[in-house]
C-alpha cells in the first residue's frame, strides 16, 4: 500500500520496524495508522487529521467507518476513564463450544504444576487434526492471555504425533479458560514512558532435548506490551548460560520496541534473577566458562556498553517472567498474572 501524504513508513535500514505501521507527526501531535490486510486501525491526538485521513482513503477506495474501535482482529476493546481493556472472550467461547466444554468444571491453572509429557508415552489420537486445531487457536489467544503462553508452547511440541495425554493436557487448558473466560489485559490511561523487561529461563527443562526455555515480559510503563515463551535453540551447559541466552532474546525485543518508540530516550531496564548471568553481561572479558557462547549472545553486553540497556537483579519470587517458563501453583500463578495486568474488566 502507498502511504497517504504525510505518512512515513520506517526507513529501509531499520529492518526491525513494523512496516504495517504508518505515522504522521505535526509538532507535538501525531496520528498512527495500523493496517492488517483490509482492516485498518487509526488513532492519535489530532481529530482533524484523523478525519482528513479517512476522507483521503475514501477517495481511493470504498471504506466502511465502524467508529470507535470495539473489535479488531478478534480482540474486544473496552474503555473507561482509567484505561483500555483487551480480551478475547467471544473467541474463547467459540473454542469451548466446538470442544463441547461450555459446562465443564473449571481448573485453577493452565496446566498441573508437575505435569510431565513425552513424545512416546500414551495412545496415539484417532483424530490428531482436532488437537492441532485447538493448539493453533490457543496460540492466537495468547495475544491477550499471557497466562497461557507456557502451556501453549509446551503443547505445541507434540503437533506432529499427538497422543492421549497431550489431548488431556489441552482439555485442562480449556477448563482453565472456562473459569477465566472474561479475563484480559488492562492498559492504564496514565503510564510512564519507560521500557522495563523481566527475563527468565528454565534450565534444561525439556526432557526430550534438554534445552532450556526462554521467557520474558516487557512493560511500557505499567502496561504489558510484549511477552514470549520459547525453547532455546542450543543446549546450555549451566543455568547462568541459559539465563544469559534469555537476556539476549529479551534485549533483541527491547531494541525492536525502541525503534517503534523513536522518541524514547530513557535507559531500558532488564530484570534478571540470576546474578551470574548478569555478571557475564557486564564483564567485557572472556573466560573459560563463557568463551563457548555464541557471539550473538554477547549482544546484551554490547547494548549495556552502548548505554541502551541497564540490568538489575530481582529475587526469583518477584520474577514476573517465571510465569512464562514453568507451570506454577494456583497462588503463584494468580499473583503473577495479576502483576502482568491480567484482570476482569469492571462492568
Q: Where are the model-predicted features located?
A:
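Alpha-helical coiled-coil heptad-repeat oligomerization segments
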Residues: 48-59, 123, 140, 154-158, ...
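Reverse-transcriptase-like RNA-dependent polymerase core
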Residues: 1-14, 25-26, 103-118, 211-228
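A short glycine-rich, hydrophobically flanked beta-strand micro-motif that places a catalytic Asp/Glu
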Residues: 16-25, 182-192, 256-269
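RNase H-like nuclease module associated with reverse transcription
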Residues: 71, 194, 212, 224, ...
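Mobile genetic element proteins and their domesticated derivatives, centered on retroelements
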Residues: 1, 21, 38-40, 53, ...
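Two-metal-ion RNase H-like nuclease active-site motif
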Residues: 137, 195-207
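Metal/cofactor- and membrane transport-associated sequence elements
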Residues: 1-62
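C-terminal reverse transcriptase regions that engage the nucleic-acid substrate
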Residues: 36, 65-184, 315, 323-325
Amino acid at each position: 500500500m502507498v502511504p497517504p501524504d504525510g505518512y512515513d513508513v520506517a526507513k529501509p535500514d531499520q529492518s526491525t520496524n513494523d512496516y504495517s505501521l504508518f505515522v504522521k507527526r505535526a509538532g507535538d501531535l501525531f496520528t498512527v495508522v495500523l493496517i492488517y490486510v483490509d482492516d485498518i486501525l487509526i488513532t492519535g491526538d489530532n481529530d482533524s487529521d484523523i478525519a482528513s485521513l479517512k476522507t483521503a482513503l475514501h477517495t481511493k477506495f470504498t471504506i466502511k467507518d465502524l467508529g470507535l474501535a470495539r473489535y479488531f482482529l478478534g480482540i474486544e476493546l473496552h474503555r473507561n476513564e482509567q484505561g483500555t481493556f483487551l480480551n478475547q472472550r467471544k473467541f474463547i467461547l467459540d473454542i469451548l463450544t466446538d470442544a463441547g466444554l461450555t459446562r465443564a468444571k473449571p481448573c485453577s491453572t493452565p496446566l498441573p504444576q508437575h505435569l510431565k509429557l513425552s513424545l512416546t508415552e500414551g495412545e496415539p489420537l484417532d483424530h490428531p487434526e482436532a488437537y492441532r486445531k485447538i493448539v493453533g487457536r490457543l496460540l492466537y489467544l495468547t495475544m491477550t492471555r499471557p497466562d497461557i503462553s507456557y502451556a501453549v508452547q509446551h503443547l505445541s511440541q507434540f503437533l506432529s504425533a499427538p497422543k492421549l495425554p497431550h489431548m488431556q493436557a489441552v482439555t485442562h487448558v480449556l477448563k482453565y479458560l472456562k473459569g477465566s473466560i472474561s479475563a484480559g489485559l488492562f492498559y492504564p490511561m496514565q503510564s510512564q514512558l519507560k521500557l522495563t523487561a523481566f527475563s527468565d529461563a528454565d534450565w534444561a527443562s525439556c526432557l526430550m532435548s534438554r534445552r532450556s526455555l526462554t521467557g520474558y515480559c516487557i512493560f511500557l510503563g505499567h502496561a504489558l506490551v510484549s511477552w514470549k515463551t520459547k525453547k532455546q535453540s542450543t543446549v546450555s551447559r549451566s543455568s547462568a548460560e541459559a539465563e544469559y541466552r534469555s537476556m539476549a532474546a529479551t534485549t533483541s525485543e527491547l531494541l525492536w520496541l525502541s525503534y517503534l518508540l523513536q522518541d524514547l530516550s530513557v535507559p531500558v531496564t532488564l530484570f534478571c534473577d540470576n546474578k551470574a548471568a548478569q555478571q557475564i553481561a557486564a564483564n567485557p572479558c572472556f573466560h573459560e566458562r563463557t568463551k563457548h557462547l555464541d557471539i550473538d549472545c554477547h549482544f546484551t553486553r554490547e547494548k549495556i556498553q552502548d548505554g541502551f540497556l541497564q540490568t538489575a537483579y530481582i529475587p526469583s519470587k518477584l520474577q514476573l517472567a517465571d510465569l512464562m517458563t514453568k507451570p506454577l501453583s494456583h497462588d503463584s500463578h494468580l499473583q503473577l498474572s495479576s502483576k502482568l495486568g491480567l484482570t476482569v474488566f469492571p462492568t
